[in-house]
Amino acid sequence: MRAEVLAWMQAQRMTEPGDTVVCAVSGGADSVSMLHVLLSLQDTLGIRIEAAHFNHHLRGAESDRDEAFVRQLCASLGVPLHTGGGDVQARAAQTHESLEEAARKLRYAFFDTLPGLVATAHTQDDNLETVLLNLTRGTGLAGLTGIPPKRGRLIRPMLVCTRAQIEACL
């Protein structure tokens, strides 16, 4: 998987030597794998790896356990960690957005405060789901493009991997 991610990142020109890449780490398999893979590639790519965790506070103590896990993981790996959080339910009520949309907007607003590039752990499976959802919404050919590998400061190095590949590596 490491070689696939490296080749993908180079083909997509995701980073340049000297870049800081902040991995968005939820605590789930995809983002934890991404953190490990990018750490293993930092010398090869000449990049600096940091991490970020956004606590949505939607699952009570479970959300706090996710944050504690990410804190412990980053400490054990020696990776600087940026943390943030927000009241997703309050935003959704105020803006009449769905919880998912409110969470996404708060999370991406947090990402905007981070240094360098921000890596999210979207996979081939996520991309397929996005394409199918776009088709059902009637987006036409534009919807067939799916999740872009790089958009602005956001990079998606794991788009080359399936969820099954990621789970097999953990």
Q: What role is predicted for each listed range?
A:
Residues M1-V25, A29-C169:
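Core alpha/beta nucleotide-donor-binding catalytic domains of modification enzymes
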